[in-house]
Amino acid sequence: MTDIMTDTQKDTAAGAVPTRSGFVALIGATNAGKSTLVNRLVGAKVSIVSHKVQTTRAIIRGIAIHGSAQIVFMDTPGIFKPRRRLDRAMVTTAWGGAKDADLIMLLIDSERGIKGDAEAILEGLKEVHQPKVLVLNKVDQVRREDLLKLAAAANDVVAFERTFMISALTGSGCEDVMDYLAETLPEGPWYYPEDQISDLPMRQLAAEITREKLFLRLHQELPYASHVETEKWEERKDGSVRIEQVIYVERDSQKKIALGKGGEAIKAISTAARKEISEILEQPVHLFLFVKVRENWGDDPERFREMGLDFPK
């Protein structure tokens, strides 16, 4: 009988370091800093960030190489008490991502501590059997004595494999996280090409960037009542790209806010989004934004599919 060896086994037999790979789900309450941390660990912007809660709506995968390991980070929507259909879909997606991962990283905002949503997430993790690590974020804002108490309290509820204290904003402590993951993930071939940093299609990433600029520009409830889709993507002969996107809102009054006085708001959103998309593509971009009213788009299964979410019953 002939034994067949995988490439990884051949490398190991030859004395090379075996490759490792796996999926790491980042979960936590809204605005714990998950997207900022994913961007930091990947070394590039793969997930949009704003100061508003519920910015991340679907799982965004960011891919990092550390030594001989390929680490696929799953930036999940913040977990909170859902009130509407979209909320339920986001929370279900977050827990689903956790259960599909090789390892779970619970990110807790050290300034807020364990209360409300964070407390409920800890209780929920008792029913999830994947290995778990605790990551305390924003530790530069909290006394060490309080951090130790916070870590002890969380570990009293869930048996974490390790506890890390980091600042996603400055990068402090992040190298320790990467070292641990690179040593812990299972041996196996990489899932993605070495130069790939995300599995998000460019059309969807462009829509996410525009949605980020919408979040940053507009206030109150409008960002949560809006959705952005890329409807047209045309590569032009001169090397530029023409992109048409639609911002869906629920009411005429919201459309007026999105447009702004004399179109001021939509122009600012378009300029900021076009600049960033152009930098990512490394080619000129012509971005055209349209605002349309679609009542109850949050109850439309097609919109959920566009966002990468399952439509809850």
UniProtKB/Swiss-Prot annotation:
Main location (coarse class): cytoplasm
Keyword match Nucleotide-binding: yes
All residue ranges annotated as the Era-type G domain in the record: 20-187
G3 as annotated region, ranges: 75-78
Membrane topology: Peripheral membrane protein
Annotated region (G2), positions in chain: 54-58
Cellular-component GO terms for this entry: cytosol; plasma membrane
Keywords: Cell inner membrane, Cell membrane, Cytoplasm, GTP-binding, Membrane, Nucleotide-binding, Ribosome biogenesis, RNA-binding, rRNA-binding
Domain KH type-2: 218-295
Gene3D superfamilies reported for this sequence: 3.30.300.20, P-loop containing nucleotide triphosphate hydrolases
Binding partners and assembly: Monomer.
Function: An essential GTPase that binds both GDP and GTP, with rapid nucleotide exchange. Plays a role in 16S rRNA processing and 30S ribosomal subunit biogenesis and possibly also in cell cycle regulation and energy metabolism.
Protein name in UniProt: GTPase Era
Gene symbol of the encoding locus: era
